[in-house]
Amino acid sequence: MMDNQAVKSLLEMGIPHEVAVDALQRTGGNLEAAVNFIFSNELPEQAEMGEENDGSQPRISENKIVAGTKPCDVPNNGDQDIDMPDVSGVDVDYDDDEDITDERSGSNSTSGCRVTAQNYDRYSISETSIPPPSYSIVQHNEFKSNVGDPTVVLPLPLNSLIESYFGLFALLTAVYFPHVFLKPDFKDLNYRADWFKGSSFTEPKYRLAYCEAEDGSTTSEIVLASGPNEGLQPHLLWQLQKLISVVNTRKCERAFVSAKVFTSSLEPQLRSKLADSEHLYEVLPAFIKSLAVDLEMCPGIRDRETRSLFISSALHTPNKNEPPMETFLSLFHFLPEEYDSNLYKMFNVLLYPEEEEEEEDVIRGGEQEEARYVEPENTLKEVAPVLTILFNELETNTESVSLPNGVDIPLEFYPQLYTKQCKDQLIRHIISKRKQARTRSRCLLQEINELKSYQGKNISTILESTLAYLQTIPDDANNEAAKQIASLKDTLNSARAAKMEEYKDLASKLHGEWNLSHPETHIINTAKQLGLIENPYILTMAALSPYSYFIRSRNGAWSWIQSNTLGTEFKVKKCSSPSVVQEAIKHGTKYASETPLMFIYCEEGKIPTEEVVAEALKSNSGCLKFAEDDQNSLKTLRSQFFDGMGDPEQATNNINNGNDNDNDDDIDSDN
């Protein structure tokens, strides 16, 4: 058991309770080792070996329901024992947008996102898991029973896992940046009643035509097509505009759209890239770039205008003796071994390498001059309004990963803390202060220990024993000696108390105003006061897998969508509070996941209002017509139900009974 006195001792030093408990757990209750770990991040050899040799930790999270929780408290990752046809994926190379974190992954495993159904059978849902949803496409439940529910993007089977994430990214774009992609108006998107299935691709009646200007540049215009396509056409944009039309129409009744809508329109290079990729992080940047390039083909859109929406810039220094090079990235990705207790800690390791170097220097007892600071290995230059973060999936060579509390993904994130401007004007100063505080704290601990004991004996105990002895023989000499010893004791106590107060003050600052792992406690406010950061980035999507994802509406309401691995059944549940999403993420990140996890943040100031979206949709005649055609198609389908059932009221009830996913109770935040 943990020694309560040890916890109390750390609390008296100004260490937060959770930090104290964690440090004692890591060091087996050893107080001295715990203090050393807190300020130097150095574990005793035995503790480190114990962690390395612990092979008993599970590597797969089966998302079993914990006793006492409600069935809806734990997300279902969609794993089920099913047979399915073998659907092959297809598609190519974009070197522009290489992720600067690629160099860190170093993974050459042959197992990737293209997982077969047989592999998933080993991790089938247990009897205590959430029952499979009962929303059946076979029953033609294309209608929402509540028009306020989000339109769902249904995933593809497991052997097309990566493509399912394409659909989720497109959905996020359709919800949060429709006004950007509604700028080109193709007049008539050529509606077909089965468009939402993605089984076929239909081109609009108006397409792009290219002409060469006098200066040699090429311009485009939207014209009525008179024959076969000549030149590049924005196939992916057309499909995205169809989705935008539906999800942003008020009182839309379209319940779902298949992710196949987007895979059917991938251009050849992207198909080739997809065929050669084993991991989502390898091919998602190409999909994002393809979306942007499609829009930039259109008239009135400046080159690279759209790419800046998704693609951030960074400064990368491969060698400290070389100047930094600008590079571009559309996502960050982390290996399971790089999971940490919160997202800021994970970014710190990636983008604050000097912090790690300073810790090592303190451990060695060395000193570094301020002038030795050089450009960090990686730093952000500009952060795009859309920030995509991937947690890589479990692989055969993945080390055992176990985080008892999972990863804390904040609802509001400030990636601006990792820009060069913020690091130069604030973070370097904090890192320097942290280094000095750690060095001083270690000295104080040593000095306090020297004032407390000598050759393993407690000095206060010796002085008290001596005083007690002298007081048994009351003569002038002994009385004088007793006064001197009492004075010495008071001096020692005062010196110890002063050093302890200084130590507590440093500890408070390290875990408060200089805490890089929890910048929300102080650093973010300081950065705002200095004008270095403004808007937070809002968590808008959390995909634990394509079969279990959370999405936030523009007004802040969260929904949880679950589906089976065939993409034929799904459930929609309303979340009673955002904390439900955070708890689900923590549960899903306690161990390495079988599928990639995707988190998407959007800059608060760039999220459009309902009025802006409505105006953009109203101004695009092609999308407006498509939305009307889709709603008319659903009305026709509903009338066919009426004709078949005889009683219109009964027919409506039958449709709504099939949509029982829309009538589930809200997910309670009280677990």
Curated annotation (Swiss-Prot):
Residues 432-501 form a coiled coil. Keywords: Coiled coil, Cytoplasm, Nucleus, Phosphoprotein, Ubl conjugation pathway. GO terms for cellular component: cytoplasm; nucleus. Residues 1-41 form the UBA domain. One of its GO terms (biological process) is protein deubiquitination. It is found in: Cytoplasm; Nucleus. Residues 661-671 have a biased composition (Acidic residues). The keyword Coiled coil applies. It holds the Pfam family UBA_7. Gene3D superfamilies: DNA helicase RuvA subunit, C-terminal domain. InterPro entries: Rup1_UBA, UBA, UBA-like_sf, Ucp6/RUP1. The keyword Cell inner membrane does not apply. Residues 68-87, 643-671 are annotated as: Disordered. The modification Phosphoserine is found at S56. Present with 5930 molecules/cell in log phase SD medium. Forms a ternary complex with RSP5 and UBP2. Modulates the activity of the RSP5 HECT ubiquitin-protein ligase through its mediation of the interaction between RSP5 and the deubiquitinase UBP2. Involved in regulation of cell wall homeostasis. This is UBA domain-containing protein RUP1. The gene is RUP1.
